[in-house]
């Protein structure tokens, strides 16, 4: 930081403040994680100096010979990790990865997609009216059964037969249960549609077999690399070789220019890390931790959407507590516990307020915490939510959070 501190002390100070926030607190946002020092080093490298429009062996600029090797390593490692036929590592984000699939197989203003409603667990880029996807395509959305709070595959099939979409999107940002990707592809096949699985949240779990993988099951698989994969912020697309050329064309020149080669290098590093046996142990622990935390919260009387979790996240319904998600998020934040407000099935509040909280275990698991610590964290959450106006309790919990965090380095030896 010495160069930055000299050149721009304001930015250096703010980065240090954020470092201390992460060090001293507990990161329980389900979409966040910690990258390794190796990934950080790759992302901060001189690769950021170079333009590399195009693909390996077909660049529009000279001097890309090392960039070609880096991108090929990233692609090959991703294919090995997921046993994929074709991989594109250039998307700047998961949303752009999704956009590339849509652009490849749908006609703007004409074709229809079918996807999970945002309020019931989906994602903005899956056809929300405020997203490009909802503005450019016709959209029909499915949800969960309001009694079980699970995806009703029969209802999905019934809707598909009625609306006849060009693409069926599966995958979610706030669904705590296992997704049956094979069932979605079979439904898509029955109506002549493509199926796209967005595994941004569960990619690390899918890569290690902790959650069933959609790769080679559905037509297209998209993901981010920064959640359970524990890599840099970015996106990827995997598909069968028959779709590879049109996907690559949709990314470049379709919607992006030069790839972010420093980020692609970071992706390559994270894919290598995910291929190690220790990463499978990590993925298993993420789920064990989520289930341990869910057990503690549920036993204390908090209502868990669907009754628990099969993956890395927990969705809490605060309706019966007289709290909003926003109020709970703010109170827990004061105690050093970072979570996010989230809509729940049958939501009746604004997405800026919500009736729910989303909690995840990837980041605290990366710090080395296990089930015992999850029970402890669950108790912290319960104490704060019991009375969010009790500043003395919030202060006491914050001190305990800091003490717990101090025992688990932000960068343990495994990172």
From Swiss-Prot:
Site (Plays an important role in substrate specificity): 226
Domain of life: Archaea
Enzyme class: transferase
Catalytic activity: (6R)-5,10-methylene-5,6,7,8-tetrahydrofolate + glycine + H2O = (6S)-5,6,7,8-tetrahydrofolate + L-serine
GO terms for biological process, alphabetical: glycine biosynthetic process from serine; tetrahydrofolate interconversion
Subcellular location, record wording: Cytoplasm
Gene Ontology molecular-function annotations: glycine hydroxymethyltransferase activity; pyridoxal phosphate binding
Segment forming the signal sequence: none
Cited InterPro entries: PyrdxlP-dep_Trfase (IPR015424), PyrdxlP-dep_Trfase_major (IPR015421), PyrdxlP-dep_Trfase_small (IPR015422), Ser_HO-MeTrfase (IPR001085), Ser_HO-MeTrfase-like (IPR049943), SHMT-like_dom (IPR039429)
Modified residues (N6-(pyridoxal phosphate)lysine): 227
Known EC number: 2.1.2.1
PANTHER family: SERINE HYDROXYMETHYLTRANSFERASE, SERINE HYDROXYMETHYLTRANSFERASE 1
Family membership: Belongs to the SHMT family.
Name of the protein in question: Serine hydroxymethyltransferase
Origin species: Methanosphaerula palustris (strain ATCC BAA-1556 / DSM 19958 / E1-9c)
